[in-house]
């Protein structure tokens, strides 16, 4: 067990045990309320903010100005197309900047899945996530456990292989569906 904790699981152990204060705020885009909450938090805590997959740059710039943040305090990142890519596209940047603790801002219905995926991916770099839920405007149904598990498995596959296996799995399912 000691060898396992000293080997491949060491970054996860470091992430869980870190007592470092947050060094970055990460907003998973897709909802203006998330971005607004992240901007307000960045202003209050005076932390750098990364918005991944958010609204268009012009609107985001307007929101930044409205919240009194400088462009240098906010990074807009449009590389991600889904929750897994939100983390895989940024985790090396965060590690390179010496970030060990991130405040993760997303909608309350999305937070459990985002924390599952993010903890698997960011944990490989010794980065701990603390969730910051944003209330939905109207009632929002919680995402099912199946979605959380499937994305968690995708994240684990990414950790093991370095790639997202979703396109491969989709192609296999299509191939199986085309059999006579």
What are the functions of these language-model segments?
Residues 1-22, 36, 164-180:
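Helix-coil boundary and N-terminal low-complexity module in membrane systems
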Residues 7-149:
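A structural signal for short, hydrophobic/glycine-enriched beta-strand patches
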Residues 72-76, 149-155, 174-180:
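A general structural signal for short secondary-structure boundary/capping elements
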Residues 107-122, 161-180:
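Contiguous hydrophobic segments
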Residues 141-172:
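A transmembrane-helix-recognition feature enriched in membrane-embedded lipid enzymes
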């Amino acid at each position: 067990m000691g060898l396992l904790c000293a080997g491949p699981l060491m970054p996860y152990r470091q992430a869980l045990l870190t007592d470092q204060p947050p060094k970055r705020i990460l907003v998973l885009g897709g909802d203006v309320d998330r971005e607004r909450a992240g901007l307000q938090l960045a202003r209050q805590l005076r932390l750098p903010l990364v918005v991944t997959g958010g609204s268009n740059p012009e609107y985001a710039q307007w929101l930044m100005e409205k919240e009194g943040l400088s462009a240098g305090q906010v990074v807009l990142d449009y590389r991600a197309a889904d929750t897994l890519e939100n983390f895989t596209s940024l985790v090396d940047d965060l590690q390179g900047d010496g970030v060990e603790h991130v405040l993760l801002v997303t909608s309350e219905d999305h937070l459990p899945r985002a924390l599952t995926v993010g903890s698997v991916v960011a944990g490989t770099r010794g980065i701990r996530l603390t969730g910051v839920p944003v209330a939905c405007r109207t009632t929002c149904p919680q995402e099912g456990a199946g979605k959380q598990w499937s994305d968690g498995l995708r994240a684990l596959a990414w950790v093991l292989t370095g790639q997202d296996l979703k396109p491969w799995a989709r192609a296999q399912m299509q191939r199986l569906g085309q059999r006579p």
